[in-house]
């Protein structure tokens, strides 16, 4: 495996020096992992954020984020302002953006109106028409790597069948529930799905607040996808929410209870399938406690609202 390039404050300084003639007033690294690094800087009156990855494939994701953010902003969704995406200055993918004002929604207790706002923004995002399904869509000029149909996406990209096999192999679902899932997954390719833009991870951790009870930005568009809305969006967005928060989100989205009921089973199926790779990792790590929690969760033991 090729050794990854080292990312330091000097790496970030080189990017800022190329695009801004004014001297940096401050430069600090906010956080960094094995492959993703985030820096904050002040240049004149500008407060900026620089994201750098030492994985070359990340350039595609940065380009996708840039397209998705602009498309969503055109629908009046509050988003970060991405100024530049490239890999020519430091031979690594980077993204320069203006710093978002506000605080993370996870930093304080919030009311139901924030969830209504999230739902309304989700509806606006999902109103952006796109072509094809998955990670490669309108932002890219590529043609050979596209999934042109929902059926192709499920088989070749999402790999729904393999996810079911993972659940079966590790005996996560009770036999009767596994049987129901297999029947539902066989029906998925035949459902009428039209692609639109999805944020892909519209949860509280990706929401910034302005301190006045309003959302100032929807952030972290790495998982943006051209997919079937609202089913795909809801499968993740509703995952962490309590019943009151779910109802507020759906109210903000503008979907009536009867309409939601029609798609609720599909949302459940997608949600369960999302666990496939996570379960495989837990099994590989021999994390029996995690597998027991998944078994409890996915068989409905934690659902206090239905029989």
Each predicted region: which residue ranges?
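An alpha-helical support segment within catalytic cores of ATP-dependent transferases
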Residues: 3-23, 127-200, 210, 290, ...
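ATP-binding pocket architecture of kinase catalytic cores
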Residues: 26-149
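Alpha-helical scaffolds flanking conserved acidic
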Residues: 262-270
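Active-site Asp-x-Gly
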Residues: 195-197, 203-262
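Active-site activation/catalytic loop segments of kinase-like enzymes and analogous catalytic loops
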Residues: 231-258, 271-288, 295-301
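Short beta-strand segments
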Residues: 51-52, 83-84, 138, 197-200, ...
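Glycine-rich, phosphate-binding/catalytic loops in enzymes
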Residues: 66-67, 113-114, 214, 233-237, ...
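Conserved catalytic motifs of the protein kinase core domain
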Residues: 45, 92, 193-195, 214
């Amino acid at each position: 495996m090729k050794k990854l390039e080292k990312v330091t404050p000097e790496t970030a300084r080189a990017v800022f020096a190329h695009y801004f003639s004014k001297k940096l007033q401050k430069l600090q690294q906010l956080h960094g992992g094995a492959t993703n690094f985030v820096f904050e800087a002040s240049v004149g009156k500008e407060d900026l954020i620089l994201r750098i990855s030492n994985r070359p494939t990340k350039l595609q994701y940065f380009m996708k984020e840039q397209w998705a953010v602009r498309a969503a902003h055109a629908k009046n969704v509050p988003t970060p302002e991405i100024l530049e995406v490239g890999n020519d200055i430091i031979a690594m993918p980077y993204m320069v953006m203006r710093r978002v004002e506000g605080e993370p929604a996870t930093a304080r207790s919030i009311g139901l109106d924030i969830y209504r706002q999230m739902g309304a923004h989700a509806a606006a995002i999902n109103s952006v028409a796109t072509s094809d399904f998955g990670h490669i869509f309108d932002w890219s000029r590529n043609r050979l790597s596209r999934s042109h149909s929902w059926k192709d996406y499920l088989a070749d990209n999402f790999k729904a069948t393999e996810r079911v096999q993972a659940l079966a192999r590790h005996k996560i679902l009770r036999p009767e529930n596994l049987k129901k899932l297999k029947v539902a997954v066989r029906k998925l390719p035949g459902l009428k799905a039209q692609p639109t833009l999805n944020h892909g991870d519209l949860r509280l951790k990706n929401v910034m607040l302005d301190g006045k009870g309003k959302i100032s930005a929807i952030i972290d568009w790495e998982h943006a996808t051209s997919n079937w809305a609202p089913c795909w969006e809801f499968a993740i967005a509703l995952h962490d929410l309590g019943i009151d928060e779910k109802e507020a989100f759906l109210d903000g989205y503008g979907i009536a209870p009867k309409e939601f009921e029609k798609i609720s089973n599909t949302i459940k199926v997608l949600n369960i399938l999302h666990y496939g790779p996570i379960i495989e990792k837990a099994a590989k790590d021999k994390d029996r406690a995690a597998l027991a929690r998944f078994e409890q969760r996915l068989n409905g033991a934690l659902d206090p609202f239905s029989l």
